């Protein structure tokens, strides 16, 4: 496929990139578990998530049209940003003169195709001390904007122990001869768009369905330092047996999330 495709009219392809990012920790006591949830809830509140999504919008070359954000009680946050490929012209008479405005289906159609969303899900196990934080991000674009440009930035913006990534292209556009194009760029794997340092840091598994333009990559952090997973304590506070038991439990938790199955 050539680098510069000559298209007939607007590029109607929709590209969607979805992330599930997990941060895992061990908090021994109920007080430590509550403190972890409060800490992660404050660290990734709606205000900070909004800034991260604004950065994503800038990275992929889009423009912010509207922002909706919310912090939830007792914990959790969500942000949705409506984006456009081209910045709205504030001097365009359509935007400054009184009028009925766009039809609802126009606005909703745009929202369905070009938006960035994030939701957070803190969680803890009441008995074994394991706490997890899941963050879901969706970047969906139409036109010439590619959400793949945001891959590395998003992975490094969070404490990403496990990352599940899905990328798909839907719809079709046409070249100047009227021939349908169901994808407008070369891709064999999401890994094609990851930086080398990211590839070195993670164990990765692909499940791709090329004929359907669906690409799936799972990522598990290779480096394991127990101190990075202890909340409210350090390895020096533990006996050898305690440290080994906690490490085994953490590794099991991470593998179960990575493979999406219980390993009992």
Swiss-Prot record:
Site-annotated residues for Cleavage (non-hydrolytic): 113-114
SUPFAM superfamilies for the chain: S-adenosylmethionine decarboxylase
Catalytic activity of the protein: S-adenosyl-L-methionine + H(+) = S-adenosyl 3-(methylsulfanyl)propylamine + CO2
One Pfam entry name: AdoMet_dc
Catalytic EC class: lyase
GO CC, any one term: cytosol
Modified residues (Pyruvic acid (Ser)): 114
Free-text description of this protein's post-translational modifications in UniProt: Is synthesized initially as an inactive proenzyme. Formation of the active enzyme involves a self-maturation process in which the active site pyruvoyl group is generated from an internal serine residue via an autocatalytic post-translational modification. Two non-identical subunits are generated from the proenzyme in this reaction, and the pyruvate is formed at the N-terminus of the alpha chain, which is derived from the carboxyl end of the proenzyme.
Gene3D superfamilies referenced in this protein's UniProt entry, alphabetically: S-adenosylmethionine decarboxylase
Names of the cofactor(s): pyruvate
Record GO biological process: spermidine biosynthetic process
Active site (record annotation): 114, 119, 142
EC number: 4.1.1.50
Keyword Transmembrane: no
Pathway assignment: Amine and polyamine biosynthesis; S-adenosylmethioninamine biosynthesis; S-adenosylmethioninamine from S-adenosyl-L-methionine: step 1/1
Molecular function terms, GO-annotated: adenosylmethionine decarboxylase activity
Keywords: Autocatalytic cleavage, Decarboxylase, Lyase, Polyamine biosynthesis, Pyruvate, S-adenosyl-L-methionine, Schiff base, Spermidine biosynthesis, Zymogen
Cofactor note: Binds 1 pyruvoyl group covalently per subunit.
UniProt similarity note: Belongs to the prokaryotic AdoMetDC family. Type 2 subfamily.
Family annotation (PANTHER family): S-ADENOSYLMETHIONINE DECARBOXYLASE PROENZYME (PTHR33866:SF1)
Biological role: Catalyzes the decarboxylation of S-adenosylmethionine to S-adenosylmethioninamine (dcAdoMet), the propylamine donor required for the synthesis of the polyamines spermine and spermidine from the diamine putrescine.
Protein name (database record): S-adenosylmethionine decarboxylase proenzyme
Species of the source: Chromohalobacter salexigens (strain ATCC BAA-138 / DSM 3043 / CIP 106854 / NCIMB 13768 / 1H11)
């Amino acid at each position: 496929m050539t680098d510069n495709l000559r298209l007939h009219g607007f590029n109607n392809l929709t590209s969607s990139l979805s992330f599930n990012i997990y941060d895992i920790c061990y908090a021994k006591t109920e007080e430590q578990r509550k403190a972890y949830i409060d800490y992660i809830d404050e660290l990734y509140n709606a205000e900070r998530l909004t800034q991260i999504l604004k950065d994503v919008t800038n990275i992929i070359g889009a423009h912010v049209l509207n922002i909706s954000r919310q912090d939830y009680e007792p914990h959790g946050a969500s942000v949705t940003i409506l984006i456009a490929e081209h910045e709205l012209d504030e001097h365009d008479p359509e935007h400054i003169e009184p009028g009925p405005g766009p039809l609802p289906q126009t606005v909703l159609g745009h929202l369905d195709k070009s938006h960035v969303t994030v939701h957070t899900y803190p969680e803890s196990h009441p008995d074994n001390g394991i706490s997890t934080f899941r963050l879901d991000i969706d970047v969906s674009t139409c036109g010439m904007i590619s959400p793949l440009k945001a891959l590395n930035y998003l992975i490094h913006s969070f404490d990403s122990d496990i990352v599940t990534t899905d990328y798909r292209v839907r719809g079709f556009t046409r070249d100047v001869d009227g021939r349908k194009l169901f994808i407008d760029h070369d891709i064999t794997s999401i890994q094609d768009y990851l930086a080398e340092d990211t590839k070195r840091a993670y164990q990765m598994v692909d499940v791709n369905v090329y004929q359907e333009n669906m690409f799936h990559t799972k990522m598990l952090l290779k480096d394991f330092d127990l101190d990075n997973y202890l909340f409210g304590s350090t390895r020096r506070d533990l006996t050898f047996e305690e440290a080994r038991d906690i490490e085994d439990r953490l590794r099991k938790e991470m593998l179960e999330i990575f493979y999406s199955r219980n390993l009992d």
